[in-house]
Each structure stands twice: as structure tokens, then as C-alpha cells.
Amino acid sequence: MAETLISPGVLARENDQSQITSQPVQAGAAIIGPTVKGKVNIPTLVTTYSEYLANFGSTFDSGSDEFTFLTSISAYNYFQNGGTSLLVTRVASGSFTAASSSKVSGNDGLVAGAGTFTTNSFEADGAVTGSTVTEVTGSSNGSGTGAEFAFVFEAASTSSFDSITVTSTGSGYAVGDTITIPSGSLGATGGAGTDLIITLAAGNIQQSNNIFTLETLAEGTIMNSTGPEGATGALDSGSANNIRWEIVNPNTDQGTFSVVIRQGNDRTKSKSVLETFTNVSLDPKASNYVARVIGDQTQTLMGAGTANPYLQTTGSYPNASRFVRVKQVNVKTPDYFDNSGVAKTAYTASIPTAQSGTFGDAVGNILTGTGNYYDNISNSDSQGLVGGNYTDAFNLLANKDDYRYNVITAPGLIYENATHATPLNTLVSNIENRGDAIIVMDLKNYAGTVAGATTTAASLDSSYAAAYWPWLQVTDPDSGQLVWVPASTMIPGVYANNDRTSEAWFAPAGINRGGLGSVRQAERKLTQANRDTLYTGKVNPIATFPGRGVVVFGQKTLQNQASALDRVNVRRLLIELKSYISQVSDNLVFEQNTAATRNTFLSQVNPYLESVQQRQGLYAFKVVMDSSNNTADVIDRNQLVGAIYIQPTKTAEFIYLDFNILPTGATFPA
């Protein structure tokens, strides 16, 4: 079709702009660290703590002690303080593969096997005479693992004639069908050639070793261990963090069955069902195909160890299950009808039997460290990990096209530890490049000092990072134990509470918005002099006040230069403004560089900034996008320039109250 007009006329053209593009994962906060189970190096969005527990687990045993990772404590506190969405990335050490399901076996069943064939050529030690009849039953055809058979020719290595081999790779064959092979197709080794007729007769396939295979999407601390079901239904090595599978309700009339995912430590008579997928089949053409219903996709971290890792997704069907995927279907049933469209009467070869089993054959260790937890975290071991285990996750979350969040933390990494400082510097650099989040980090191990905290802070310079001190004692929500945690474990919850009750540009500090109600005590009760030293040194003190409890009492960033951006609330204000205005600007790319386009921008940005001003985020603002900064030269370079001037609202951090005592009868000043 012509795309231009030569003579006068009308040319109607199509421009499809209805494509649906994938959106980045949106979360309020991002937490990176070890968990009991879950996908490793796969950022996962959760919206409640219950959902977090289902995906990542809670407590675990190490020796005779019970522990909870800081990641879990931080997630609990975040949701308790009003957080609504959390992006969790599990990190691990060691190498491993996911666990697969134990054998999912099926029944014997009626299939279309090779029946009798007649020909005047027959292989028998090179002698070919007369007419011979032979039969090959379905049970001996090929590997005996499917109901579909093809007939192929293979050249004999020691004879001049060909032979017929039956394989299980064909399709469309049904009982009673005939296949005619023209005369001469077998070669010339004596005897007159006549047509070879093969009739497909009924045959029984042997029981399949594995109808289909499930694979876990996540690995437990010791991973999903296989084990037999005992008399009470207990799974050996089973735990609440492992899972098992069960096949129920096999229907030989419909060719369907149901898949149940159960908790690993449940009992046959007291099942703890996590998920159920009903009436699935092995028919890849059907909407209830088991892989389509449960999902068969898996994500693999590519480019590990580089500055630009990414996730590669393989598989055809998105995962509806949170715990497993269909790794492979070994016995597919294309349809349940013969070539005449008549329904068959037996489906037992198409479905597994009622049974249950476990997951096993996982290889490797999730945790290879000695396991220093809570206040024992050190340079060489942080919860079974070392600093380098975090790098891939940090670099993966640097991609703002895929992941959005406004605060990020990795509780357990302490900047004073040399092996922790390197990945934390990577994280700071990544967030500065993103420009849309703030990092909450820890400076000192447990039992640090005020001077040590300020000395460590002096080596950092970024308005996208903030540090808090000292450590805090909290009650582990899952084990009930009192444990010591670094401040970054709790601060995302403070930010969540601040945003729930106020706005992002309000200071997440002070009695009203900085209270740490779930904290039992701070590692150290800071004096006024301690707080002064810390705040002068860019460290936000966590103070203890009688009757008020433990309170975040500072909101500085780690920026060295004294400016508005050395405060957390101003940095977060800029993040909010840039995020909204950038989205407005995205819609202008490739639009005409005219006054109309500029007015479109102004008509959206000015009202937004007015609303921020009304909500106490700005004292004043001005937006310029006109001919003064979009000259002819700028336009000729295909540029559109806007200038946004803002006066951020400052917080009242230093309040001076002068009490003046006057003599009796004195006049008060105007």
C-alpha cells in the first residue's frame, strides 16, 4: 500500500499505540538480606508480614539455638508501622540447585500400539523368503513412556535392506488406524515388493516412572529434604519451611486430577494445605494443562559478579504458585479423541494416581559461614554471610526501570567492617545514580563508641544516605526472644510511619514521628553532649527520654556540604518532586517542541507543586519553560528545557525559648 499521496486524495494510516508495557515493581521500601527460605537474588514484592512469612520464613535452628534473621525482624517492624509494600531480596552464600519432586507415577492404560503387518520381505539373518506375519505390542514399543507412536526407517548397518523401528515421538495415531508403506520402501533384498500395511492395535504401556516433575521456587536454609512419610504421616526432616506435594481426585472419565501443595511438617490426618490446583490435565492444548495452571517459569540471575546482572525468565506460563513450578511434563496427552472425533473411554494412561511425596535432590549449601547473629556480627561473618554475597543483589536493584522504592537497607552489613564497606559503597553509588531513594546504613558493630561512629561517618559523603546509632534491643516477633539489632533494622518502619501519618517531606524524627515503640532499650542512653557530638558528625542519634521511650532524634544525611540536602526530609522531598515531574516529562518525549507542549507540562507541574506547598513541603516555587530558556538554538538541538526553582520547607530542629523575668508593674514589650 502506498504511504504517500502524489495526486490529491486522502490516505488513512494505522498507528497502533495500544501496546501494553510492563511496569516496574513499586514498593515503599527494599530490604536485602538472608532469609530462612525464598528465591535467592530474585526481588520479591510482599504486602503483608503474613505474605512475607509464607515466602521467606521466620525462625530457624542452628545447633541448639533458635535464630531469626534481621531481614525478618525488619520486615515485621515495617508492616507494624504502616508499611504497605516491601521489596525483599534474599541473599545467600554457597552454590545450590532447587529441589525437585519425587516420582509422580501414572497407571497402565490402553494405547495405540503397533499391531500386525504383512509383507513378502522379512529380515531373518539375511534370508528373505515367503510371506511372514509378526506383531509388536504397545508395551515393547520405543521407551514405553507415551501413548503416541511413529514409524520410522533406519538403515541397517550390516544389510542392504531397511528395517522398521517404532518410536514414541509421533502423534495422531489411534487404535484401528492403518499406515501403508509403498512397495520398495524397504529396499531390495529378495522377494517381490508389495505394499507394507501396518495396523495399529491396542497395547498396554508399562507404568511411567515419572508423569511430570515439580520444582521448588525457593530453597530452605537446609533446603527441602526428601524423606518417606511415616506411619503418622510425618515427613522425615520435614519442617514448616519445607513443602510436600500431593495428587488427589484423579478422574479417569475426564482425564483430570488435582495438585495440592502442603507444608512440609504436616500430617496425613491433619494436612496444612498451602495451595490447591484443581482439575488439571496433561493436555497441552487445554486451558487446564498442568503447566499452564501452575506455571512453568523460572528466573535465573545472569551476569553474576558483574556490574550489570539481570534476570532471565524461561518457560511459557507465568507462575500461579508461590512455591513450585512445573519443571517438565514427561507424558503429554495432546487430546482425548480419536481421529474420527469420538471420545475415548479410558484416560488412565493420561493422569497420575492418587499419591503424595516430597522434594529432594537439592545440591549445595545456602549458608557457608559459621553463623554470627545479632550482636556477634563481625567482619568475617554476618548471619552466615560475608559482604561480597550482597553485591549481585545491590547491582540488580540498581535498575530503576524494573524496581522502584524510596528507602533501602541491608541490616547486618556494618560499614566499619572492611568486607562490608565495599558492597555498601557500591550500594551508595547505585542509589546516587538512580536518584530516587535513600539508604539507611549502620556504621559500627555492637559495643561501638560515639567517637567511633562519627569517625566512620566522616569517611562517607552522600545526601542519599543516612546513618543512625546506637544498636537497639527488641523482642523477636517470632521466637519471643530479646535480641540486639542494628538501627537500620528498625528505621524503615519509622519512615513508613512518617509517610502514613504525614508526608515524605516531614522529618522522620522526634517525639511525634520518630518514636520506636517496639524497642525495649537502646544500647546506650545518650546524653545531650553525646547527641551533640553525633549530630555534628552526621550521625542521627537515637535518644532515650523518661516517659517518652526510645526516639529517633536526628534527620541528617551523610552529606558533608552544609546545604538543604544535608537533611533527610529535604532529600526525600526532592525524590518525590523528581519522581512526579519526571513521569510528566516522559509523556513529552517526541512531542512537537512548541508552546503548546510547554504549556502541557506547566499545566500539570504547577498544580502539583501548589499542592505540595499547601501540604507544607515548600515555602515557594517557580517553574520556567518558555522562550527564555528554549531559544531557537536549543530547539534546533531537539531539546526541551525546564527550570524548576523551589524553596524547601525547613524543620524546626533548634528551638530557643527566652524566658524574661520583669519587675512588678513593668510594661510588656509590644
Explain the meaning of each model-derived region.
Residues 213-237:
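Extended, Lys/Arg-enriched charged tracts that mediate electrostatic binding to polyanionic substrates
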Residues 1-105, 116, 209, 250-258, ...:
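Structured, hydrophobic secondary-structure cores that serve as assembly/anchoring elements
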Residues 71, 75, 130-134, 173-184, ...:
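Extended Gly/Ser/Thr-rich low-complexity repeat segments
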Residues 152-156, 248-250, 626:
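Short beta-strand micro-motifs enriched in acidic
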Residues 106, 114-116, 241-243:
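A short, polar beta-strand/turn micro-motif
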Residues 229-252, 394-399:
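Intrinsically disordered, low-complexity regulatory segments in eukaryotic proteins
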Residues 113-204, 236:
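Conserved, function-critical positions that sit in or immediately flank catalytic
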